């Protein structure tokens, strides 16, 4: 594993699943990690994990992580999440755009409001994250 000592990573969608594992992997390689997602508390037992449980687990294993509240539907939240990461760690070198939403069912049965939600979380949010992160990534 290549060393990421001195690097800072922001992982969106890091409260569970692939994002959680990416955050933990990057931390194990030495990166400081901003664990970003909107999940601050478990509201559905089928979806365990929060930004706090993931960042706590990283810190308990000797890594460096902070929880960052970031709602991919909210442009201000995305900008604030990038700013908080840079303020806390001093730089931003890596972005993992992992946040996504899945609405089960066929295209024929999906509601229009769910299409809007998918658009906001799966396309618009990641583009906004890259827009706000790009100036910091270019400095890295």
What feature does the model see in each segment?
Residues 3-36:
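Canonical Rossmann dinucleotide-binding motif of NAD(H)/NADP(H)-dependent dehydrogenases/reductases
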Residues 7, 63-64, 91-92, 137-140:
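Active-site loop of short-chain dehydrogenase/reductase
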Residues 29-52:
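Conserved glycine-rich Rossmann-like NAD(P)H-binding loop of the short-chain dehydrogenase/reductase
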Residues 49, 69-81, 112:
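The beta1-alpha1 cofactor-binding region of Rossmann-like NAD(H)/NADP(H)-dependent oxidoreductases
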Residues 61-64, 84-97, 103, 111:
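A glycine-rich helix->loop->beta "capping" turn
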Residues 130-131:
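A short, exposed helix-loop element centered on a Lys and neighboring polar residues
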């Amino acid at each position: 594993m290549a060393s990421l000592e001195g690097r800072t990573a922001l992982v969106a969608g890091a409260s569970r699943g692939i994002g959680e594992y990416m955050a933990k992997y990057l931390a194990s390689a030495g990166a400081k990690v901003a664990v970003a997602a909107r999940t601050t508390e478990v509201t559905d037992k089928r979806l365990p994990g929060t930004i706090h449980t993931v960042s706590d687990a990283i810190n308990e294993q000797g890594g460096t992580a902070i929880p960052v509240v970031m709602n991919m539907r909210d442009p201000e939240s995305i900008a604030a999440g990038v700013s908080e990461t840079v303020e806390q760690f001093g730089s931003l070198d890596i972005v993992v755009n992992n946040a996504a939403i899945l609405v089960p069912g066929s295209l024929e049965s999906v509601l229009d409001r769910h299409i809007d939600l998918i658009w906001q979380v799966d396309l618009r949010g990641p583009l906004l994250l890259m827009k706000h992160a790009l100036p910091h990534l270019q400095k890295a």
